[in-house]
Amino acid sequence: TYSGKNPMVKLPVIPGHEIGAVIEAVGEGVPAHIQPGTPCTINPYTACGSCPSCRNGRPNACQFNQTFGVQRDGAMSEYIAVPWSKVIPDPEISSQDFALIEPMSVGFHAVSRGQITDLDVVMVIGCGMIGVGAIVRSALRGARVIAVDVDDSKLALAKRLGAAYTINSKTENVHTRLQEITNNFGPDVVIEAVG
């Protein structure tokens, strides 16, 4: 938090877990597909592999997780050194676009966890990158998506990316609009992506 009281963070720490970078150099034993000059992202999470969450196939919920930019110094620096196994290179994706993968993935994961199908009406509150990920993934699964935000430009993007309906919660009554859109049934799934 801005007050520095997040119990997960050990200060001081360099932030930065949404990583888009270009590989500067590689060490010995690094596979040939990881080459200097190649844009990449970094998997920012390091799981222990032995806690109950890891043993149950949920390394994202590892009790001893070490995330770049949270528990370990992150990418808001000129250079970072990372194990090659964390590097995801692709010469076709820019480092700027790579930085969007982590937050988009959070939205995609929320849709998977919500088991959203083409039978669902999904309300996504917040049209930042996590919300956009949820909107895109829900639309790809055939759900009817209702995007809610206070920013008309974000709502316009949400519409272009698959939202069937948009609601500006600053200028419209959300409850009334939901009732109109859903014939008084409301959404089947709500994803809060405001933070």
Features from the language model and the residues they span:
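NAD(P)H dinucleotide-binding glycine-rich loop of Rossmann-like/cofactor-binding domains
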Residues: 48-125
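Mid-domain Rossmann-like dinucleotide-binding core that forms the NAD(H)/NADP(H) cofactor-binding site
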Residues: 93-172
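Glycine-rich, N-terminal phosphate-binding loop of Rossmann-like dinucleotide-binding domains
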Residues: 44, 170, 194
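Short amphipathic alpha-helix with an adjacent loop that forms part of the alpha/beta core around
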Residues: 172-184
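Short SAM/SAH-binding signature in class I
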Residues: 185-191
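Glycine-rich beta-strand-centered segment in the early N-terminal region that forms part
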Residues: 3-52, 91-93
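Well-ordered beta-strand positions
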Residues: 78-79, 144, 165, 189
